[in-house]
Amino acid sequence: HRPDGKLLEDTVRPLQEEGVLLMADCMTIEDIRHAYELGFDLVSTTLSHNKPAIETSLNEGPDLPLLRQAVEEFPDLPIICEGHVHTPQDARAALDAGAWAVVVGTAITHPTSVTSWFKAALDE
């Protein structure tokens, strides 16, 4: 259920009837499957790094395993890689894994984070 008490389906349907393009921010392959079943126009891996640590060993970089699985399962659905894209190499890896597009956020909008990444790498 949504904060307004509606099912996602009940929110999505009227928007689709009006021709609105819909993107689903997803955490898991199950989320992507559900978005596909509901007819979302595209999905992103934005929330994949929000999984509990026990479910993922991802610490850095985009969730390429989820991206690859989604691209394989849904070859006609645009999959956007979003989240933890810190370097041009991360973006290239996402495109090579089949991403339809890549979103670079914090790496270009938050200098404090970028500085901490460099410091951590140099302290190793």
Where are these regions (language model features)?
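Active-site-adjacent beta->alpha loops and helix N-cap segments on the catalytic face
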Residues: 1-15, 29-34, 51-71, 88-92, ...
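Short beta-strand/loop segments at the ligand-binding rim of alpha/beta enzyme cores
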Residues: 14-24, 73-82
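Alpha-helix C-cap/termination motif
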Residues: 17-18, 38, 73-74, 97, ...
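Flexible, glycine/proline-enriched loop segments at strand-loop-helix junctions
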Residues: 19-21, 57, 105
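Catalytic cores of alpha/beta
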Residues: 28-39, 81, 85-104
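Non-cysteine beta-strand/loop elements that form the S-adenosyl-L-methionine
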Residues: 41-48
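Charged C-terminal helix
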Residues: 124
